[in-house]
Amino acid sequence: MKVKITNLRALYDTGDIKISPITVLLGKNSVGKSTFARSFSLMKQSLFINRSEPVLWYSPDLVDFGSFKDSVTKGYDEIGFEYSFKLSTEELELFSRYNFLLRTLSLANSIDENFNKEITVRFSVKENQISYINILFLDYNYQIKYDNRYKVESFIINNIPTSLGELYSRSDFSLGEIIPQINLKNHPEELSGSFSLGGRAFALASWKEIELLFSKIKDGRTNKNTIQKILKKVILGDYKSFEKDFEKTIKGWKTIYQKYLGLKLDERQSFTSRLYSLIGQVYYNSVVDLINEYLSDYFSEVQYIAPIRATAERYYRIQGVSLNDITSQGENVPMILYNLKPSEKKDWKEWTRKNFDGIEFDVKQDSSNLSLILAKSGQVINLADTGFGYSQILPILLYLWRKTKMKRTYFRRGFWNTNSNQSLLIIEQPELHLHPALQANLIDSFTRIVKNEKLDVSIIIETHSDTIVNRLGEHVMSNKSNINSDDVNLVFFEEDKENNGLAKLRQIKFDEHGRLKGWPVGFFEPGPIKSFLGDAQNVD
């Protein structure tokens, strides 16, 4: 996944930030690190509720950005989000062949397995609405602009505007939807009540345009079925490959092929360019479904852990709180531990003992109350009687253990299942109240979990700790670790003094020897001590 954000608080333009297995956010205070880290939870809380605006700026359970006006960079009126992700050939084939809408139209092209499978979606948000969408899929470049009532002002594919009539999108957003579908106003499919397929009218109207285009090369015996047979044989990829494959395919229909060759060269090029664009129109709402489903699946597995986590209390009342996700401050950790099965509890304690210096965490019930217990070296202590460090690290450890042991719950919105199993853990300042040795132990656990192919976990760490950075470098250098330089991305945030102090981001990598390339010298060093003599001399 690559992410780009523009005009969100201090983030004027992040550039394309690669989310590596381990991504570390570094920089001084108030330069946009937390804004970037929390933007993932912002998308999560937006996607999983029916709402009247694309982005839900406040949620009591996740993050609070206030409002759009509080969030947009001063002097600007829109915020931009961009996400790029890759799908496997198998996933794209499933999309093409088993998409219900495309099956209905008998247009389920195979997709060129050698073509770039990356999909990029960009969208700009003004107050209460999306104003612009740009999608890059295969060799299609979709650009959609809206007015303030979600009427489509322009719909352009590969620089070719659509000519279908009045287009619009709904102004409300349903569960799992961030990119709205395009609808065709006053179309019979919409008025007949079969519009529940979502955007079917737009696809059908685009198909009619394809039939009209074929009138230039068809004979009297060519009908809709013939056109469908031709297009089902054409492989989709980049435009040049499509053009060659189309010409190769229509050789099986002698009259059509002869009429096609009878066109002038520029007319043939115009024909195939228009055809490629119209197939893109047919695909558009299905591509939107694909994007919404992928992003819903990705953000559903975001776990955010805040910098200030719940401190241990002496007693907890047994409650019926949510146990699916660990809350951002870890308030529900005692109840999650309480509800573990005996076999799970045994495994949990063995895991923490093995990975964290012989430490075990458990809960003890006394009537209707619970106590968090820490056991080490034969001693059992109420967690409230230990230092802050253990209570701060507990939610992180519990998340890591759950990822290694518990089955994945998929969010499935639509017609198509992916094999995605990816999860994203975001932690702000995991080093709080932790001795450097425990910080190193934590990083060791992170490296083990991100290299487990069955889990597909990525971790974003916002930190001020040189211990964490140095430990990652040791893992890159060490022959005992599976971590290499491509697995770690350090994102350095700094003030751009030439741009009103807004954030400027740089991505820094380790080399194969664990040395940082382009590291800002003295970043972790304090400035020189200033003289206080002047202050002392002014004291009466």
Residue ranges and their predicted role:
Residues 1-92, 342-525, 531-539:
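Switch/communication elements of ASCE P-loop NTPase nucleotide-binding domains
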Residues 17-20, 96-101, 316-328, 506-508, ...:
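Short, polar loop/linker segments at the starts of domains and inter-domain junctions
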Residues 243-393, 398-420:
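Extended helical coiled-coil dimerization/tether regions that scaffold
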